Regions:
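Amphipathic alpha-helical packing elements
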Residues: 15-66, 72-73
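Short, small-residue-biased leader/transition segments that mark boundaries at the very start
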Residues: 1-8
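Aromatic-residue-lined binding/catalytic grooves and analogous aromatic/hydrophobic interfacial grooves
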Residues: 83-138
Length: 138
């Protein structure tokens, strides 16, 4: 199961975390930001989880292309490829636009994220071994 448990931290405090009741639980990172809209969305459906897993693999491939090395998260790729057992098995739900409302200009999250990265995160832009995406100049 991918279930919510209250357990004791290394310091003896009770903490809420999600547990995979198989060998994956000992190798994945501890859960953080479990109430973030994107984390909630990921747990809503197997299709959501699978979309995010595919996106993770694409990001790792892009990192390898740009920097010529393998990102540390790549070690977890196959472990995270299969969704937890108790996710609801229904169609993909609408992805949230998890950003300040000033950047939300559409019902389409892709449009909103493009707007957010063009206008709210331009200080982060570097295009190592790549040209900027076409939508960046539109």
């Amino acid at each position: 199961d991918w279930s919510s448990d209250v357990c004791s931290s290394d310091l003896g405090r009770n903490v809420k975390r999600y547990v995979l009741r198989d060998e994956r639980d000992s190798v994945v990172y501890k859960a953080t930001h479990i109430n973030h809209p994107s984390a909630i969305w990921t747990r809503e459906a197997v299709s959501n989880y699978n979309w995010l897993a595919d996106h993770m693999f694409a990001l790792m491939k892009e990192y390898n292309y740009r920097y010529g090395k393998v990102h540390k998260c790549n070690e977890l790729g196959l472990t995270l490829q299969s969704p937890p057992y108790n996710l609801k098995d229904y169609d993909m739900t609408k992805m949230p636009s998890a950003m300040a409302t000033q950047y939300i200009i559409s019902d389409d999250p892709i449009t909103n994220y493009r707007n957010y990265y063009k206008n709210g995160k331009s200080h982060l832009h570097t295009w190592t071994n790549r040209n900027p995406p076409e939508w960046m100049n539109q």
